[in-house]
Amino acid sequence: TFCYTPNSQNPDTPGELPKRLDYRMEWEDAFRRYVNALHDKGLATVAESYEAAVNAASGAEEGLFAQTKENSHAAGGTSKPVIICGDLNVAHKEIDLKNPKTNTKSAGFTPQEREKMTELLESGFTDTFRHFHPDVTDAYSWWSYRMNARAKNVGWRIDYFLATADLTPRLVSASILPDIMGSDHCPVELVIL
């Protein structure tokens, strides 16, 4: 499953919580239910657009989510491995960004967003990068365009490959490729058998 995770959007006034934090929390719960249904019921789908992903995660009866329900019969309702890939707009742990102390109210690092990531992982997903590199510091996948952040490696790790636990024995490696330019993000890589 790949999709764009909504950002909770930083506030206009410094020191306040992100503007869309409540929406982000609802979305996270719906997305967790959705990807667990993909795994548990063997539902086959790919979220091909932001709108389709939002509809699917929010439980919308039209569009992708409805198609997914129909596909469950074709898939036989058996368990299916799931990999979530992309920009999840959250740095899960303090180790996942350069300046955690000054960012606890920043979109992508609020306690609420980090807790939702913990809930997703505890529902049966593995953070593949941390599986192989539990203590590696200064490993980031996103840098602001401001203040020469990339050159100084003042970044956040917000791009992930999350895999269901049944894939863990097949994981070979997971990497971040910071030397590949092209945007404010760099590629992340997962090798699986």
Please place each PLM-identified region on the residue numbering.
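Active-site regions of metal-assisted phosphoester/phosphodiester hydrolases
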Residues: 1-193
